């Protein structure tokens, strides 16, 4: 959507008194310039809390500075870590380096003006249960408000779904298409 269309929708949301908005964009900060523009739109209504998913490995210095200046309570962030295993991230074709993701998570968790949660995804290729438990323990050291463990969903049209047989992943053919 264009920034103008988003602004119009944001205004309608505000007019209706809605206080929590979940932005369904799994790559909110894939384009840091656009992310900054969106944050400036959100800043205009500090009485609304915007819930975003952010990729901590892709935080530019400029976006970090922008996040630090936002009003307290404007954002609730989910930091998409997915796994702390390089082989899992590589097999899943996750962009960004793990070291950058952890540095980004550390930065986000240090911000006192927003709540940050860390997300892990069970069911990723090569990701074993014992490793998930180890990763949860490791993430507790970062100070995230919550550590969320979600199951992998193979949505139609996604690369992971196209590669399911190759990766040995079985999933439900019915929504929400979770790994079995």
What spans do the regions from the language model cover?
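Mobile, glycine- and charge-enriched loop segments
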Residues: 102-127
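Short, hinge-like loop/turn segments at secondary-structure boundaries
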Residues: 39-41, 68-70, 135-136, 164-168
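Short beta-strand segments at enzyme active-site cores
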Residues: 20-25, 116-119, 148-149
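Catalytic cores of alpha/beta
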Residues: 62-67, 125-143
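Radical SAM [4Fe-4S] cluster-binding motif and immediate context
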Residues: 1-110
């Amino acid at each position: 959507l264009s920034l103008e269309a988003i602004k119009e929708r944001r205004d309608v949301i505000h007019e209706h008194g809605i206080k929590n908005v979940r932005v369904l964009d799994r790559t909110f900060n894939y384009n840091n310039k656009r992310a900054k523009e969106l944050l400036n739109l959100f800043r205009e209504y500090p009485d609304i809390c915007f819930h975003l998913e952010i990729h901590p490995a892709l935080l530019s210095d400029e976006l970090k500075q922008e996040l630090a200046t936002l009003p307290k309570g404007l954002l609730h962030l989910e930091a998409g870590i997915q796994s702390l295993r390089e082989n899992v991230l590589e097999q899943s074709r996750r962009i960004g380096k793990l070291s950058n993701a952890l540095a980004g998570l550390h930065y986000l968790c240090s911000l006192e003006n927003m709540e940050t949660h860390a997300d892990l995804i069970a069911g990723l290729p090569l990701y074993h249960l014992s490793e998930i438990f180890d990763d949860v323990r490791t993430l507790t050291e970062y100070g995230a408000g919550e550590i969320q463990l979600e199951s992998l969903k193979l949505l139609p049209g996604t690369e992971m779904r196209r590669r399911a047989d190759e990766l040995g992943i079985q999933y439900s053919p019915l929504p929400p298409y979770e790994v079995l």
